[in-house]
């Protein structure tokens, strides 16, 4: 079975990594959908889709995950929830299930006839991308504890912290 795992991954954190591992214990292949692919260079979406793809791929490689079982595909947003599942389907290989804890995503895919696999919360209270981005914008190194080592390296290598600090400045 092939399953879809959608998210913005701004940034890809240890909770996301745990969901990927959990999913690959249950499905043959996993399609990681990098959502809001058109968004970047904002405090809410600091990384480009390509930067997120690179960070996710390096994190999975670093963890020894077989990349032959994983697709990482950027998908831009549309502003119509009722058409979103069909929109996503145009970007990804066929799939039978979706991995999510998001109530809206769950409803949309269930209504479209897909099986929903709901992973455990995996440190949901600790691994919150909004909090990670806030720490990054402040220059607080604690954010590094919340993301896979490879993701922290990519973020530093690409200058994402500097980008966020600049974006957080006031006129």
UniProtKB/Swiss-Prot annotation:
Per UniProt, which keywords does this protein have? ATP-binding, Cytoplasm, NAD, Nucleotide-binding, Nucleotidyltransferase, Pyridine nucleotide biosynthesis, Transferase
Q: Which reactions is this enzyme annotated as catalysing?
A: beta-nicotinamide D-ribonucleotide + ATP + H(+) = diphosphate + NAD(+)
BP terms from Gene Ontology: NAD biosynthetic process
Q: Which HAMAP family match?
A: NMN_adenylyltr
What NCBIfam families does this protein's entry cite? arch_NMN_Atrans, cyt_tran_rel, PRK01153.1
Task: Please verify whether the record's keywords include Chloroplast.
Answer: no
For this record, an example GO cellular component is:
cytoplasm
Which Enzyme Commission number(s) are on file for it? 2.7.7.1
The principal location of this protein is cytoplasm
Q: In which pathway does it act?
A: Cofactor biosynthesis; NAD(+) biosynthesis; NAD(+) from nicotinamide D-ribonucleotide: step 1/1
Q: Does the keyword Transferase apply?
A: yes
Top EC category: transferase
GO terms (molecular function) for this protein are: ATP binding; nicotinamide-nucleotide adenylyltransferase activity
Q: What is the official name of this protein in its record?
A: Nicotinamide-nucleotide adenylyltransferase
Subcellular location, record wording: Cytoplasm
Q: Which family does it belong to?
A: Belongs to the archaeal NMN adenylyltransferase family.
Q: Which PANTHER family does the record match to this protein? A: BIFUNCTIONAL NMN ADENYLYLTRANSFERASE_NUDIX HYDROLASE (PTHR21342:SF0), PHOSPHOPANTETHEINE ADENYLYLTRANSFERASE (PTHR21342)
Q: Which InterPro entries match?
A: Cyt_trans-like, NMN_Atrans_arc, Rossmann-like_a/b/a_fold
């Amino acid at each position: 079975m092939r399953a879809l795992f959608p998210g913005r991954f701004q940034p890809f954190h240890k909770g996301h990594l745990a969901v990927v591992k959990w999913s690959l214990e249950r499905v043959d292949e996993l399609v990681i959908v990098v959502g809001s692919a058109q968004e970047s260079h904002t405090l809410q979406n600091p990384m480009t889709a390509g930067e997120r793809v690179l960070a996710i791929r390096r994190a999975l490689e670093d963890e020894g995950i077989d990349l032959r079982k994983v697709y990482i595909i950027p998908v831009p947003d549309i502003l119509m929830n009722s058409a979103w599942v069909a929109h996503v389907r145009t970007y990804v290989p066929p799939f039978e299930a979706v991995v999510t804890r998001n109530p809206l995503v769950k409803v949309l895919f269930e209504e479209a006839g897909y099986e929903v696999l709901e992973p455990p919360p995996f440190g949901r209270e600790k691994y919150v991308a909004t909090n990670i981005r806030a720490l990054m914008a402040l220059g607080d190194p604690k954010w590094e504890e919340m993301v896979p080592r490879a993701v922290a390296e990519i973020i530093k290598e690409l200058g994402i912290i500097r980008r966020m600090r600049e974006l957080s400045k006031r006129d």
